[in-house]
Amino acid sequence: MPGIKRILTVTILALCLPSPGNAQAQCTNGFDLDRQSGQCLDIDECRTIPEACRGDMMCVNQNGRYLCIPRTNPVYRGPYSNPYSTPYSGPYPAAAPPLSAPNYPTISRPLICRFGYQMDESNQCVDVDECATDSHQCNPTQICINTEGGYTCSCTDGYWLLEGQCLDIDECRYGYCQQLCANVPGSYSCTCNPGFTLNEDGRSCQDVNECATENPCVQTCVNTYGSFICRCDPGYELEEDGVHCSDMDECSFSEFLCQHECVNQPGTYFCSCPPGYILLDDNRSCQDINECEHRNHTCNLQQTCYNLQGGFKCIDPIRCEEPYLRISDNRCMCPAENPGCRDQPFTILYRDMDVVSGRSVPADIFQMQATTRYPGAYYIFQIKSGNEGREFYMRQTGPISATLVMTRPIKGPREIQLDLEMITVNTVINFRGSSVIRLRIYVSQYPF
């Protein structure tokens, strides 16, 4: 008799029993006797017991008992039970008359299912699927999950539950992405900085080798972490766009790059020398070519080839004017017995020298010295002619010697002829005479 068992099971929850030796009836736990009606009524523990449930638990009254359930995961009651309403008010069986021996009556009473359950056609309490019947109270951001006797509201991925509401989780705060993170409702997306690409895991970034994929540089591409740099070949410099290379004009950097002339070329430069010079192994310095030594001159047999810096000079044989006589290839003498030689220098010696253009000054360029020293004689050195520009002077360095000093830089090409006179004075024999060095100075065109 399964139906009778179910009725007895429910009836036992609120059974009135006579107490031996006491005429008053008693009720089971969770019920209290209503003396006016003589019925056992449910006790609302949620109202009568202080702090029946503590913390985040909520008290739910039931017939003969109460439950504590979490506030954040409420379980809603079925249509046959409402703990917040007054107890069941249907007809209860009358109190049994006192008997000498207990005799439990059979009480006919409707079956009441616990909340979250409902009666099926076979009078069985079955779970109510609140999620399927749309009888839940989950908000649109939540997912309804049916449970035995109730349901729970859960949050979808990307949300977390707070005070009954599903709030978006800001995944970007927790460093889910390696580089750039964009939070969106319920999710997030990772992106990478320029120069990187997103890996298959959707979170980490990998460097893009721009040099291997597109090679944006005109000359040399060097891949770097997250970017690239362009480099230029020697002799070129990188333009402002960081991609193109333009020729570097090395000649404009310094006037001392080459000794003579700097010639710029795409990606390089070279030094050149003027005619009469050759370029040395350092590829910048120029050295004079000795045309006279290499017989690369145009002098005839009567002339003498004199090498200059950057050229040569064909010197004609000297001509001694009257009353002088030529006594060698470079010397003229005025005979003492000739009356015309009384006030003339005794000898004229021809000398040649060259100096570079713009030579630094002061510079000692020529030395003059008496070949014979007579007792009681002294010597005076002076520039007799050719120094109209006051570019030279004679400095006596000893009793019988002097030095020609250049005092001003001279720009070439230029030829200068100086007559340097040495006067001999002898007071013992009352003698005064002189001799002259006719110095021809060739100033080169270049300062080397």
UniProtKB/Swiss-Prot annotation:
**Is Glycoprotein given among the entry's keywords?**
yes
What's the source species' lineage? Eukaryota, Metazoa, Chordata, Craniata, Vertebrata
- The signal peptide stretch is 1-23
Q: Which InterPro entries does the UniProt entry name for this protein?
A: cEGF (IPR026823), EGF-like_Ca-bd_dom (IPR001881), EGF-like_dom (IPR000742), EGF-type_Asp/Asn_hydroxyl_site (IPR000152), EGF_Ca-bd_CS (IPR018097), Fibulin_C (IPR055088), Growth_fac_rcpt_cys_sf (IPR009030), Nephronectin_domain (IPR052235)
Q: What does this protein do?
A: Essential for elastic fiber formation, is involved in the assembly of continuous elastin (ELN) polymer and promotes the interaction of microfibrils and ELN. Stabilizes and organizes elastic fibers in the skin, lung and vasculature. Promotes adhesion of endothelial cells through interaction of integrins and the RGD motif. Vascular ligand for integrin receptors which may play a role in vascular development and remodeling. May act as an adapter that mediates the interaction between FBN1 and ELN.
* Xref: PANTHER family: PA14 DOMAIN-CONTAINING PROTEIN, UROMODULIN-LIKE
Kindly state which keywords UniProt assigns to this record, in alphabetical order: Calcium, Cell adhesion, Disulfide bond, EGF-like domain, Extracellular matrix, Glycoprotein, Repeat, Secreted, Signal
- Predominant location of this chain? secreted
Q: Tell me which Pfam families the record gives.
A: cEGF (PF12662), EGF_CA (PF07645), Fibulin_C (PF22914)
Query: In the UniProt record, what gene is named as encoding this protein?
Result: FBLN5
**CDD domains (UniProt xref):** EGF_CA
The protein's organism comes out as: Pongo abelii (Sumatran orangutan)
Gene Ontology CC? collagen-containing extracellular matrix; extracellular space
Q: Which family does it belong to?
A: Belongs to the fibulin family.
Per UniProt, residues of the EGF-like domain are 42-82, 127-167, 168-206, 207-246, 247-287, 288-333
Q: Which residues are glycosylated?
A: 283, 296
Does the entry annotate any disulfide bonds, and if so which pairs? 46-59, 53-68, 131-144, 138-153, 155-166, 172-181, 177-190, 192-205, 211-221, 217-230, 232-245, 251-262, 258-271, 273-286, 292-305, 299-314, 320-332
Region (Interaction with LOXL1), start-end ranges: 245-448
UniProt entry tagged with the keyword Calcium: yes
Write out the annotated subcellular location.
Answer: Secreted; Secreted, Extracellular space, Extracellular matrix
Modification(s) after translation = N-glycosylated.
Q: Which GO terms describe its biological process?
A: cell adhesion; elastic fiber assembly
Question: Residue numbers of motif Cell attachment site?
Answer: 54-56
**What's the protein here called?**
Fibulin-5
Listed under subunit, the entry gives:
Homodimer. Monomer, homodimerizes in presence of Ca(2+). Interacts with ELN. Interacts (via N-terminus) with the integrins ITGAV/ITGB3, ITGAV/ITGB5 and ITGA9/ITGB1. Interacts with FBN1 (via N-terminal domain). Forms a ternary complex with ELN and FBN1. Interacts with EFEMP2 with moderate affinity. Interacts with LOXL1.
The GO terms this record gives for MF are: calcium ion binding; integrin binding; protein homodimerization activity
